[in-house]
């Protein structure tokens, strides 16, 4: 059985945000049934860097936005692999945000 409700893994995503972004003040993590997004919420950038996991039907889409353009997009049917990719993009986002 494939999990399709991201909200069931709310604690997992919250802990991921805390572990990667604990030293960064201006980040947020929003979680709903159909998506989870971690983003830079500083007022400096009108189009902030973010990483997002979305459910679209039977597919899971992971987006990595570097603040300038869509840097990466990953689409897959397997929830566990989508979570792994979300984690990789989150780590990448944390590294980039820590430079500024």
Description of each model-found segment:
Residues 1-45, 69, 99-100:
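Negatively charged, low-complexity tracts enriched in Asp/Glu with abundant Ser/Thr
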Residues 28-30, 35-38, 52-54, 59-61, ...:
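Ser/Thr- (and often Asn-) enriched beta-sheet segments in non-cytosolic proteins
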Residues 45-71:
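Short aromatic-glycine-(Arg/Gly/Cys) micro-motifs in beta-strand/loop hairpins
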Residues 67-81:
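A short, exposed loop/beta-hairpin motif centered on an aromatic-Gly-Thr core
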Residues 82, 86-90:
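Short amphipathic C-terminal alpha-helix that caps PH/PH-like domains
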Residues 92-100:
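Short, Lys/Arg-rich amphipathic alpha-helical interaction segments
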